[in-house]
């Protein structure tokens, strides 16, 4: 598995689902909603922005991977990785000891950076596509956090299973 696949939905959706189920099992519904909701909101917003801008992929002479068939802006792999790892970092600071949460944050930052770099290296995105994906992900994670108080069922502290 190449590093770029850390931003793929084939990996992130099952990983997110398992993590959300574990959080729900332990009564951490707010954290589960943050992780799952952030990823879903990011997926939807990335595809909406791609359709709005319709930016072609970079021209290339040597393809290192098969050229994706959708639009370039913003980078979906980078946005998805950023949304997942940012929300996991926020949850880590809520449920883990600070020293462990700091390790999660550092690892998350590193993984998002190398996923973004890999998209540029593989010549399937421009730098701005990758940066826009990161910004869009941060906005979606923030939006989910801001909307959470509006979900009354989250306020009840009970186990869902």
Which residues are covered by each model-predicted region?
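Membrane-embedded catalytic cores of phosphoryl/pyrophosphoryl-handling enzymes
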Residues: 61-161
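Hydrophobic alpha-helical bundle signature of multipass membrane enzymes
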Residues: 1-71, 87-94, 98, 102-107
């Amino acid at each position: 598995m190449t590093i770029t696949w850390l931003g793929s939905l084939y990996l992130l959706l099952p990983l997110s689902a398992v993590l959300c189920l574990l959080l729900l099992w332990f009564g951490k519904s707010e954290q589960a909603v943050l992780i799952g909701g952030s990823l879903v909101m990011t997926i939807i917003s990335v595809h909406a922005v791609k359709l709005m801008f319709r930016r072609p992929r970079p021209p290339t002479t040597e393809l290192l991977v098969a050229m994706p068939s959708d639009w370039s802006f913003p980078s979906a792999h980078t946005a998805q990785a950023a949304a997942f790892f940012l929300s996991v970092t926020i949850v880590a600071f809520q449920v883990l000891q600070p020293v462990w949460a700091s390790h999660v944050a550092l690892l998350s930052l590193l993984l998002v950076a190398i996923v973004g770099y890999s998209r540029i290296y593989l010549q399937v995105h421009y730098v701005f596509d990758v940066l826009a994906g990161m910004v869009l992900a941060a906005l979606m994670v923030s939006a989910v956090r801001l909307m959470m108080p509006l979900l009354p069922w989250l306020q009840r502290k009970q186990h869902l299973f």
